[in-house]
């Protein structure tokens, strides 16, 4: 493949962090019976605009009866985000990515956005594990973050001990699955019996 040729030439390895947009939408539809609207929260930093494009196409092709809205930190403050999400009803699913702002100060990082909107009645789903423990997320479809982190640390350790990065095989997680914070799921009014 082209990447492996470049890896040899430039001495790098690659760890893919896949995002499962279609699986997340399917999971949300299962967990929120009668879901009529999907709101995607993300910043303007790549790849969120690309995810927005993919989600628009997915909704148009497979869920034409569903409304879709992308709320971005590029055009909305945290206060505007809160107001937009606070007005949602139980037929709206919210899928969260990252929420960085242009200033990149610590007070503007995603976890603070999670904490700010955690009290909203609508259930928040996520495309990444971030926010599952303390950020208000009920769940999502994702790879196993702990396995990925172990692999990352192993890869770094191998490089620090002299192994050429290009000799380390590319890594792609293959253990993606639905993950839930069951306490939060119940507190947000979702039925745990609907979990896959």
Give the ranges of each region predicted by the language model.
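Short hydrophobic alpha-helices and adjacent helix-cap/hinge residues
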Residues: 1-196
């Amino acid at each position: 493949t082209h990447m492996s040729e470049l890896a040899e030439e430039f001495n790098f390895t690659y760890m893919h962090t896949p995002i499962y947009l279609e699986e997340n939408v399917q999971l949300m539809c299962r967990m929120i019976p009668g879901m009529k609207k999907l709101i995607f929260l993300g910043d303007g930093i790549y790849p969120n605009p690309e995810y927005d494009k993919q989600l628009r196409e997915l909704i148009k092709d497979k869920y034409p009866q569903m409304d879709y809205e992308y709320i971005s930190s590029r055009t909305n403050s945290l206060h505007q985000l809160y107001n937009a999400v606070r007005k949602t009803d139980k037929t709206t699913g919210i899928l969260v990515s990252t929420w960085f702002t242009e200033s990149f100060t610590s007070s503007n990082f995603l976890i603070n956005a999670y904490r700010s909107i955690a009290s909203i009645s609508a259930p928040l789903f996520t495309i990444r594990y971030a926010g599952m423990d303390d950020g208000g997320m009920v769940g999502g479809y994702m790879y196993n973050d702990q396995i990925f982190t172990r692999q990352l640390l192993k890869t770094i350790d191998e490089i620090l001990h002299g192994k050429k990065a290009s000799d380390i095989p590319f890594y792609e997680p293959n253990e993606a699955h639905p993950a839930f914070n069951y306490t939060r799921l119940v507190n947000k009014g979702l039925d745990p019996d609907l979990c896959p």
